Curated annotation (Swiss-Prot):
Keyword Transmembrane helix: no
Motif 'KMSKS' region: chain residues: 610-614
Family from the record: Belongs to the class-I aminoacyl-tRNA synthetase family.
Encoding gene, per UniProt annotation: leuS
PANTHER family: LEUCINE--TRNA LIGASE, MITOCHONDRIAL, LEUCYL-TRNA SYNTHETASE
Record-linked CDD domains: Anticodon_Ia_Leu_BEm, LeuRS_core
Keyword Acetylation: no
UniProt-listed Gene3D superfamilies: HUPs (3.40.50.620), Isoleucyl-tRNA Synthetase, Domain 1 (1.10.730.10), Valyl/Leucyl/Isoleucyl-tRNA synthetase, editing domain (3.90.740.10)
InterPro entries: aa-tRNA-synth_Ia, Leu-tRNA-ligase, Leu_tRNA-synth_edit, M/V/L/I-tRNA-synth_anticd-bd, Methionyl/Leucyl_tRNA_Synth, Rossmann-like_a/b/a_fold, tRNAsynth_Ia_anticodon-bd, Val/Leu/Ile-tRNA-synth_edit
Keywords: Aminoacyl-tRNA synthetase, ATP-binding, Cytoplasm, Ligase, Nucleotide-binding, Protein biosynthesis
Subcellular location field: Cytoplasm
Catalytic activity field: tRNA(Leu) + L-leucine + ATP = L-leucyl-tRNA(Leu) + AMP + diphosphate
GO molecular function: aminoacyl-tRNA deacylase activity; ATP binding; leucine-tRNA ligase activity
UniProt protein name: Leucine--tRNA ligase
Length: 833
C-alpha cells in the first residue's frame, strides 16, 4: 500500500489509546508539570465545526510534545452545558433540556475522539452534573458570606421573548439580544449581583504579571476603566436636594455651564418642574426602550429634555440648567455629569443642539467651531488662570475639599456582575428567603441544591424563573416552624465556566472543590487557548473568582492562566452580488472558473466570510475526516498560516496536506532503512529537529510543518534512510499527525508500544555546520569559476583543486602562472602572463 489508509489506521489507534488509557495524567512527582487547557465548548445541537479543532489541535500538539519531553501533562476536556440554547430548544420541542444536552455531549465527544486529541477523559467535567455544580453553589455561598453576593433593585436588560434579563455584554449594538436578536428594554428588577468591583484594582494591576497579548490585556484594562479625578457636589437651586458628579477634569469646573442626569436618576422626578413633567416622563419612557450600547453611541443624534431645575456651580455660584439625556447611564459613575461644552465634544454637540452656553477655560482652540480637547493653560477660571492641568487639578481639589463640596476620587468603569437569570436551565442559587424577612444560604451539608426535573420550563412571565411554579421544591420550613421560599433565579452560564479548570485537577473529590496539594502541583494553567471573543467577560469573571478563592486560601496562586493564546478564525467561502449582499453557497454555480447566481445569472465575487448556517458555508469536520482523515485536518489547520491569523478554508489546501502525509507514509514504508549512517542527511535531519522543537515551543506550527516538508524532500533524494533519523522524524511529526506516526513507528521501532512517551529527539549542533563551502576562482582578478569544496581546506589543497578544474585549465592553457594566492574558505586568485 503506497498511501496512508486513514479509514483503517485512525480508528485502530483511537481504539488503542482508549483501551490503554494512554493519555492518563502523569503523577510522577519527580517530573515537571504542564497544564494545557482548551476553552471547553457549549455542546450545541449542530456539533463541532472546523473552527473548534484549530485551538484543540494546538493544545494537543503541545501536550504530546511535552509528554515526549518527560512532563506530567494535564490535558482535559469538558462541557459548558447550562445555558439558553438548550432551554430554548426544549421549549420549542417539548424535550427535556438534560436529555438534549446529553445527546449533544455524546455527539461532540464522538467528533472530538475522531480527531485523535489526547484528552484524559477520566477528568471530564460537565457543568450540569450536580456533583460539579455543588461546588459552583459552594463558591456562591462563600461569596454571600463575605458580602460579595448581594441583592439589589437594578434596571436590567429585559428580553420579553426570552423571559429573562441579560448582561450588558449580551446586548448587541443595535439594541437586540445576542441570543435570538430580540428587542431589549430596560426594566427595574430584584437581581443577584456579585461585587466584582471590590477586586477592580487587583484585576487591573495583576495583568502586568501575565504572559498574554497586550491587545487582550488592554481590552481588560479598558473594561475595568480606572479613572482618577474628583467627586463634586452640586446643590439644586431652591431645594435641599443635591447630587454628586464624578469628573476626571475638575480643573474645568469654571467652564461647566449645565448638568445632565440619567433619565433613571433618583432625583429626576423630585426636581422636575410641573411645566416640564410631561416632556420628562415621555423622554424617560423612550430611554427605557434603548440598550446601554445604543444610548452611548457617540455617532447618534443628541437628545435630551430640560427638567426645569437648576444646579449651582460650587466655584462661581452660577446657575446651571439640569437636563436629562439618555447618553448618561444611571449604572455608570454617579449617573450625573457636569457638562463643559468648550472642552468635550459630546457636551459641545449637546450645547449646540439645545443652544446652551459654551465657556472656554483652556486656551488653544476655537470653541465656536469645535470642542478643544487638548491640554492648555487655564483662562476664565479665576484663581486657576495661567496654571497647567496638573497644578490646576491639585488646586481645585484642595479648594473643593476645603469648601466641603468635593474630594479626590478613583472610579472604575467596571460594574458589579449581574448574576441572576430568570430561566430554568441553570444552577439553582442556594439561598432561602424566610417569611421573617431574613435570607440564608443553603448549608454546605445540603449541597448540591439539585435542579428539579419538570416538563413546564416556560418562563413564569412575572420576572421569576419557571422554578417559581414548582411549589413542592419552592417552599421550605425551618426547624422552628418559620416558612421560607427558595430563590427562583438561576445562575448565568458564566458561573460554571469561571472555575472549571480547577475541577479538572481533582474531578472526583466529594469533600472539597479540589485537593490543596494537587492545586499546588498543577496551578497555574501553563497555556490556555481559545477565541478572542472571550477576552473580557469569561477571563475577567474567572480571574475574579480565582482571586476570591485565593483570599479564602483555596487556591495557591493569584492568577489562574499564566499564558493565554487566542487562535484566529477559520473563515468560510462566501459570495457577494453587485450590492455587496451575501449569497448562500447553494444558490451559486461555478462556470469557466467564475461564480454565478443560479437564479439571476449575475456573476458573483468570491470572498471569505465567517462560517454561518444561513450562508450554508459551514464545513463539518465529520465530512473532512471521512474523506481525508483526521491527521489531514490537523496538519491542514496548523499549516494554513499563523495560529492567531484569520484564514479562509480551502479544499485545495486540504488536498495538499493529504498529499504530504501520503509522501511521509511512502518515505518510511518504501525506503530501505539502514542501521548505519552514511551522513548524507546529517544536516537536514539535525536542522529539522532543532527547527521543529523551537517552533512548537513558540506555537509557530505552520513553519514547523514547513520544515518537516523540507526534510521529506531531502530524504526522498536519498536511496536509503538511517534508522535513527527515520525514528526521529516520526517522533517530530507525531504531535501533528499522531495516527500516522503511531502506525509508522511500529514499522520502524517494532516495539508494539505507543510512540506517546518515547523521548523527544535532540539535535547535534556540530552537524548544523555546512561541511562544504563555495569558493571563487579568479584569473587576473576576474571570476572564472565557482567550486564547491570541503570546508577548512589548506592553501595548498585549495590551490591543487583550483588548478585541476577543467574550466580553469582551459583559461590558463598556454599561459605562464606567475603567482597563486589562496584564501581558505573564500577564493583562489591566479595571476598569469
Amino acid at each position: 500500500m503506497s498511501f496512508y489508509n486513514h479509514k483503517e489506521i485512525e480508528p485502530k489507534w483511537q481504539g488503542y489509546w482508549a483501551e490503554h488509557h494512554t493519555f492518563k495524567t502523569g503523577t510522577d512527582a519527580s517530573k515537571p508539570k504542564f497544564y494545557a487547557l482548551d476553552m471547553f465548548p457549549y455542546p450545541s445541537g449542530v456539533g463541532l465545526h472546523v473552527g473548534h479543532p484549530e485551538g484543540y489541535t494546538a493544545t494537543d500538539i503541545l501536550s504530546r510534545y511535552k509528554r515526549a519531553q518527560g512532563y506530567n501533562v494535564l490535558h482535559p476536556m469538558g462541557w459548558d452545558a447550562f445555558g439558553l440554547p438548550a432551554e430554548q430548544y426544549a421549549m420549542d420541542t417539548g424535550n427535556d433540556p438534560a436529555e438534549f444536552t446529553a445527546e449533544n455531549i455524546a455527539n461532540f465527544k464522538r467528533q472530538i475522539n475522531a480527531l485523535g486529541f489526547s484528552y484524559d477523559w477520566d477528568r471530564e467535567v460537565n457543568t450540569t452534573d450536580p456533583n460539579y455544580y455543588k461546588w459552583t453553589q459552594w463558591i456562591f455561598t462563600k461569596l454571600y458570606e463575605k458580602g460579595l453576593a448581594y441583592e439589589a433593585e437594578v434596571p436590567v436588560n429585559w428580553v420579553e421573548e426570552l423571559g429573562t434579563a441579560i448582561a450588558n455584554e449580551e446586548v448587541l449594538p443595535d439594541g437586540t439580544s445576542e441570543r435570538g436578536g430580540y428587542p431589549v428594554v430596560r426594566k427595574p428588577m430584584r437581581q443577584w449581583m456579585l461585587k466584582i468591583t471590590a477586586y477592580a484594582e487587583r484585576l487591573l494591576n495583576d495583568l502586568d504579571e501575565l504572559d498574554w497579548s497586550e491587545s487582550i490585556k488592554d481590552m481588560q484594562r479598558n473594561w475595568i476603566g480606572k479613572s482618577t479625578g474628583a467627586n463634586v457636589t452640586f446643590k439644586v437651586k431652591g431645594t435641599d436636594k443635591e447630587f454628586t458628579v464624578f469628573t476626571t477634569r475638575p480643573d474645568t469646573l469654571f467652564g461647566a455651564t449645565f448638568t445632565v442626569l440619567a433619565p433613571e436618576h433618583e432625583l429626576v422626578d423630585a426636581i422636575t418642574s410641573s411645566e416640564q413633567a410631561e416632556a420628562v416622563a415621555d423622554y424617560k419612557h423612550q430611554a427605557s426602550l434603548k440598550s446601554d450600547l445604543v444610548r452611548t453611541d457617540l455617532a447618534k443624534e443628541k437628545t435630551g429634555v430640560w427638567t426645569g431645575a437648576y444646579a449651582i456651580n460650587p466655584v462661581n455660584g452660577k446657575e446651571m440648567p439640569i437636563w436629562i439625556a439618555d447618553y448618561v447611564l444611571a449604572s455608570y459613575g454617579t449617573g450625573a455629569v457636569m457638562a463643559v461644552p468648550a472642552h468635550d465634544q459630546r457636551d459641545w454637540e449637546f450645547a449646540k443642539q439645545f443652544d446652551l452656553p459654551i465657556v472656554e477655560v483652556l486656551e488653544g482652540g476655537n470653541v465656536e467651531e469645535a470642542a478643544y480637547t487638548e491640554d492648555g493653560l487655564h483662562v476664565n477660571s479665576d484663581f486657576l488662570d495661567g496654571l497647567n492641568k496638573e497644578d490646576a487639578i491639585a488646586k481645585i481639589v484642595a479648594c473643593l475639599e476645603e469648601k466641603g463640596c468635593g474630594q479626590e476620587k478613583v472610579t472604575y468603569r467596571l460594574r458589579d456582575w449581574l448574576f441572576s437569570r430568570q430561566r430554568y436551565w441553570g444552577e439553582p442559587i442556594p439561598i432561602i428567603h424566610w417569611e421573617d424577612g431574613t435570607s440564608t444560604a443553603v448549608p454546605e451539608t445540603e449541597l448540591p441544591l439539585v435542579l428539579p426535573v419538570t416538563k413546564d420550563i416556560r418562563p413564569s412571565g412575572t420576572g421569576e424563573s419557571p422554578l417559581a411554579n414548582l411549589t413542592d421544591w419552592l417552599e421550605v420550613t425551618r426547624e422552628d416552624g418559620v416558612k421560607g421560599r427558595r430563590e427562583t433565579n438561576t445562575m448565568p452560564q458564566w458561573a460554571g465556566s469561571s472555575w472549571y479548570y480547577l475541577r479538572y485537577i481533582d474531578p472526583h473529590n466529594t469533600e472539597k472543590l479540589a485537593d490543596e496539594d494537587l492545586l499546588k502541583q498543577w496551578l497555574p494553567v501553563d497555556i490556555y487557548v481559545g477565541g478572542a471573543e472571550h477576552a473580557v467577560l469569561h477571563l475577567l469573571y474567572a480571574r475574579f473568582w480565582h482571586k476570591f478563592l485565593y483570599d479564602l486560601g483555596v487556591v495557591p496562586t493569584k492568577e489562574p492562566f499564566q499564558k493565554l493564546f487566542n487562535q484566529g478564525m477559520i473563515l468560510g467561502t462566501s459570495y457577494r452580488d453587485h450590492r455587496g449582499a451575501l449569497v448562500a453557497t447553494d444558490k451559486v454555480e461555478k462556470r469557466d472558473g467564475s461564480f454565478f447566481h443560479i437564479e439571476t445569472g449575475e456573476e458573483l465575487e468570491q470572498a471569505p466570510a465567517k462560517m454561518s448556517k444561513s450562508l450554508k458555508n459551514v464545513v463539518n469536520p465529520d465530512d473532512v475526516v471521512e474523506q481525508y482523515g483526521a491527521d489531514t485536518l490537523r496538519v491542514y489547520e496548523m499549516f494554513m498560516g499563523p495560529l492567531d491569523a484569520s484564514i479562509a478554508w480551502s479544499e485545495e489546501g486540504l488536498e495538499g496536506s493529504r498529499k504530504f502525509l501520503d509522501r511521509v507514509y511512502r518515505l518510511i514504508t518504501s525506503k530501505e532503512i539502514l542501521a548505519e549512517n552514511n551522513g548524507a542527511l546529517d544536516k537536514a535531519y539535525n536542522e529539522t529537529v532543532k527547527a521543529v522543537t523551537e517552533q512548537i515551543e513558540s506555537l509557530k506550527f505552520n513553519t514547523a510543518i514547513a520544515q518537516l516538508m523540507v526534510f521529506v524532500n531531502a530524504a526522498n533524494k536519498e536511496d536509503k534512510l538511517y534508522v535513527d533519523y527515520a525514528k526521529g522524524f516520526i517522533q517530530l511529526i507525531a504531535p501533528f499527525a499522531p495516527h500516522l506516526a503511531e502506525e509508522l513507528w511500529q514499522t520502524v521501532a517494532e516495539t508494539g508500544e505507543s510512540i506517546s512517551y518515547v523521548a523527544w529527539p535532540t539535535w547535534d549542533e556540530s552537524k548544523l555546520v555546512e561541511d562544504e563551502i563555495e569558493i571563487v576562482v579568479q584569473i587576473k582578478g576576474k571570476v572564472r569559476a565557482k567550486l564547491m569544496v570541503a570546508k577548512d581546506l589548506s592553501r595548498e589543497e585549495l590551490q591543487e583543486i583550483a588548478l585541476a578544474d577543467e574550466k580553469v585549465k582551459a583559461e590558463i592553457d598556454g599561459k605562464e602562472i606567475v603567482k597563486v594566492i589562496s584564501v581558505p574558505n573564500k577564493l583562489v586568485n591566479i595571476v598569469v602572463k
